Curated annotation (Swiss-Prot):
PROSITE patterns: PAL_HISTIDASE. This is Histidine ammonia-lyase. InterPro entries: Aromatic_Lyase, Fumarase/histidase_N, HutH, L-Aspartase-like, Phe/His_NH3-lyase_AS. Contains an active site 4-methylidene-imidazol-5-one (MIO), which is formed autocatalytically by cyclization and dehydration of residues Ala-Ser-Gly. It catalyses: L-histidine = trans-urocanate + NH4(+). It comes from Yersinia enterocolitica serotype O:8 / biotype 1B (strain NCTC 13174 / 8081). It comes from the Bacteria. There is a cross-link at residues 140-142 (5-imidazolinone (Ala-Gly)). Pfam families: Lyase_aromatic. The modification 2,3-didehydroalanine (Ser) is found at residue 141.
Length: 507
């Protein structure tokens, strides 16, 4: 993959998250990188004072640093700021963080040498991933602690994972053919300052939300069939007169999945039903709103993934070094909060569809989707599990961006909490996956109870896939393994293949 700074797409970023990559930096980046370094060197030669180059940091910004201490200053900031806690991030997230940092630094506004950027690229290509703890950033003044842990490896400090094994830093560098670096003026701060960890966390949340949106669309369509629901609410004319783009596209997705008719729909063409419950009928409205939130969040995250969020910034053409606040991850935090709303609603609507299938008066199916009820409890407690997960997500959906706590002796007196905003999306996604696993099981059970009638051509593959791994419930059995099997299948992203093209931002 050739990296052209500032031009990465969401599809590129999804690929980097999901797969090891080999990166080459486009040569067009070399000149701007060198010009920014030359600008820093000129400031030092002229003995001008510039924050982050020859001063302390944060509340210590007014402290001038002697020339002979500048290299030690950069090493010290990395060592002192590597104060994260918690479990290490997995390789996929670390790889994404590193590529986002490379993409930002290579735009040529950070005053960092090509040698340092190439070292990060070499580590990514060799699949040597530094130990970056999950916790320790508030998403303002950048993701200082986690990015310091990333940068430790370049200095020969800390540890890294290579092929699943933890190695001390020098041994890990050797696997990539590297030696420890000595950072020059400005370089330590350039490595530490930025929103790359916050953005990586939120991107993972986006990718998982997209995958779950696809699965929920498929399983919601299966539930329409299992509950003998109508196709009329998905008619394009209904959605066109409202004009909401997400709703229009969601309805198109349901039409694509359900088709004009199926054996199931033909079996109840002439019935006395007038309207379906909202959890079936209003899927385009609810899922369309979720799709809109996801698209808006994706736009913000795509911009941030290509942004320069360092401080100070080096504008070599004018010879200026300017202090600002691009490290403040408020856009990322708000985008993640919107994704949380979408995830919560995707799960909530799915849980209501499960409940509908359980209720014999609503679905006209045996109570709890099992024959010989009383002796058998069927899906009774599986629905309770889905309800528990749904309720848990309501609490997790509380916005993180409205939380702030002052740090650094009140110099950094407002923060975004973007890492928390992004990281909780992973837990929410896991909960939604569990809810959707139950719906998939329930919808397929309901369809099997419809005398083996086939659903649409687009939906039959989803039904058959589940039945390859989970059998029909003739009577009660140990339920948890079936939920886990369905959940694992969802995690493989098969449902993405059933979506119309260009529906979801990164697919």
């Amino acid at each position: 993959m050739t990296l052209r700074p500032g031009q990465m797409t969401l599809a590129d970023l999804r690929h980097i998250y999901q797969h090891p990559v080999k990166i080459t930096l486009d040569e067009s980046a070399y000149a701007p990188i060198q010009q920014s370094v030359d600008c820093v060197q000129k400031i030092l030669a002229e003995k001008r004072t510039a924050y982050g180059i020859n001063t302390g940091f944060g509340l210590l910004a007014s402290t001038r640093i002697a020339t002979e201490d500048l290299e030690n200053l950069q090493r010290s900031i990395v060592l002192s700021h590597a104060a994260g806690v918690g479990e290490p991030n997995d390789d996929a997230i670390v790889r994404l963080i590193m590529v986002l940092k490379i993409n930002s630094l290579a735009r040529g506004f950070s005053g960092i040498r090509l040698e340092v950027i190439q070292a990060l690229i070499t580590l990514v290509n060799a699949q040597v991933y530094p130990h970056i703890p999950l916790k320790g950033s508030v998403g303002a003044s950048g993701d200082l602690a986690p990015l310091a842990h990333m940068s430790l490896l370049l200095l020969g400090e800390g540890k890294a994972r290579y092929q699943g094994e933890w190695l001390d830093a020098r041994a890990a560098l050797a696997k990539a053919g590297l030696q420890p670096l000595t950072l020059a003026a400005k370089e330590g701060l350039a490595l530490l300052n930025g929103t790359q960890v916050s953005t990586a966390y939120a991107l993972r949340g986006l990718f998982e939300a997209e995958d779950l949106y696809a699965a929920a669309s498929v399983f919601g369509s299966l539930t329409v069939e299992a509950a003998l629901g109508s196709r009329s609410p998905f008619d394009a004319r209904i959605h066109a007169v409202r004009g909401q783009r997400g709703q229009i596209d969601a309805a198109r997705t349901y039409r694509h999945l359900l088709g004009e008719r199926s054996e199931v729909s033909e079996s109840h063409r002439n019935c006395d039903k007038v309207q379906d419950p909202y959890s079936l009928r209003c899927q385009p409205q609810v899922m369309g709103a979720c799709l809109t939130q996801m698209r808006q969040a994706a736009e913000v995250l795509a911009i941030e993934s290509n942004a320069v969020s360092d401080n100070p910034l080096v504008f070599a053409d004018q010879g200026d070094v300017l202090s600002g606040g691009n490290f403040h991850a408020e856009p990322v935090a708000m985008a993640a909060d919107n994704l949380a709303l979408a995830l919560a609603e995707i799960g909530s609507l799915a849980e209501r569809r499960i409940s509908l299938l359980m209720d014999k008066h609503m679905s006209q199916l045996p109570p709890f989707l099992v024959e010989n009820g009383g002796v058998n409890s069927g899906f009774m407690i599986a629905q309770v599990t889905a309800a528990a997960l749904t309720s848990e997500n309501k609490g997790l959906a509380f916005p993180s961006s409205v939380d702030s706590i002052p740090t650094s002796a009140n110099q950094e007196d407002h923060v975004s909490m973007a890492p928390r905003a992004g990281k909780r999306l992973w837990e929410m996604a896991e909960n939604v996956r569990g809810i959707l696993a139950v719906e998939w099981l329930a919808a397929c059970q309901g369809l099997d109870l419809r005398k083996g009638l086939k659903t649409s051509d687009a939906l039959e593959p989803a039904r058959l896939l589940l039945r390859k791994h989970v059998a029909y419930y003739e009577k009660d059995r140990f339920f948890a393994p079936d939920i886990e099997a369905a959940s694992q299948l969802i995690a493989l992203r098969h449902m993405n293949e059933l979506m119309p093209a260009h529906l979801l931002p990164s697919l």
